[in-house]
């Protein structure tokens, strides 16, 4: 390092020594000089070995903490009712995505491609909940973006890079954490182009947004202002590499089933040879969507390049009355469990009769809101009771049946039995 690590040979030349192991330049193959320090090739090799071992340990630790597809499915089952096909697809896709990130630390000739996910299913079928549950299970940053608010850069609206800014905000601007997060882009079907043919005029909220999202989804280095500041030329930007961010896009894709049926020659046509299908033989929308092909999505209005960036497609079924009743009662954070907990805090028991649950499910089906509308229905029914309850005494139980859900009667209030002495006035 200093002069004491240098000496002179018999011929008067200085002999240099490695600042780390102390070997002279004559004992090693190569001595690399730095600002007032030297390091030999043997120490460089040793440092490389240490770093390699640490990376391997980190990789093994990540691999052991990464839940397997069956374990992912078990957790999803606790929060999302039904949708087994979609849950299995997601479990495998997410597991493979994070395995792919691990493999990047290894010196491997084969580079695994990124597999982003497209969720296709009716409103309120559980698309957002699936993405949220996955992020919570994997303990990674998660954000939701609405595709309908996005526009091309330079137009009024949100730039696609704002999505990454939201993700950074969720993890206190820790770039390393954000680069392994999950982004859910909702209403992706709303940015489909208006016709199959490429548009001559500018479509800033449709095809233009798809084009803008391409690089972000595939993997690019996005420049994001720190701490949510606005962009200006003199500002330093945070550089976020999106190649390891998992993008999940979701949409209802209303009318996609007709596109699929048309391709399968099940609907339409002119002439005597055409089979006329009655309304009774109409196929279930969920089963039709399960047969979706990339060409159907392109015909619907997604550009081919965008479809290519979403190789994993999971379809969700429309929820029926039975599924909605299960959603009300079975998940870990089921709506009825949440309201029971609220009433429990007032030392009151809340009971939902079976006919009440069925009535709530029927109402949600009628409104075509899926599982999303269940909470609103229950909230409205119990609103007056929750308003009065904290001010009333002696209530031990509240009962809700079908007539209450159908607004034919108020929730039934059951009072505690008063002791005989109190009742007689003694």
Swiss-Prot record:
Q: Which species is this UniProt entry from?
A: Xylella fastidiosa (strain Temecula1 / ATCC 700964)
Q: Which family does it belong to?
A: Belongs to the ClpX chaperone family.
The record's subunit annotation is: Component of the ClpX-ClpP complex. Forms a hexameric ring that, in the presence of ATP, binds to fourteen ClpP subunits assembled into a disk-like structure with a central cavity, resembling the structure of eukaryotic proteasomes.
Q: What is this protein called?
A: ATP-dependent Clp protease ATP-binding subunit ClpX
**Which residues are noted in the entry as ATP-binding?**
122-129
PANTHER family documented for this protein? ATP-DEPENDENT CLP PROTEASE ATP-BINDING SUBUNIT CLPX-LIKE, MITOCHONDRIAL (PTHR48102:SF7), ATP-DEPENDENT CLP PROTEASE ATP-BINDING SUBUNIT CLPX-LIKE, MITOCHONDRIAL-RELATED (PTHR48102)
Q: Which residues bind Zn(2+)?
A: 18, 21, 40, 43
Annotated keywords: ATP-binding, Chaperone, Metal-binding, Nucleotide-binding, Zinc
Record's NCBIfam families?
A: clpX, PRK05342.1
Q: Tell me the Gene Ontology biological-process terms attached to this UniProt entry.
A: cell division; proteolysis involved in protein catabolic process
Quote the function comment for this protein.
Answer: ATP-dependent specificity component of the Clp protease. It directs the protease to specific substrates. Can perform chaperone functions in the absence of ClpP.
ClpX-type ZB domain mapped to chain residues: 6-59
Membrane is among the record's keywords: no
What superkingdom heads the lineage?
A: Bacteria
According to the UniProt record, one GO cellular component term is: HslUV protease complex
- Extract the GO molecular function terms from the UniProt entry: ATP binding; ATP hydrolysis activity; ATP-dependent protein folding chaperone; protein dimerization activity; unfolded protein binding; zinc ion binding
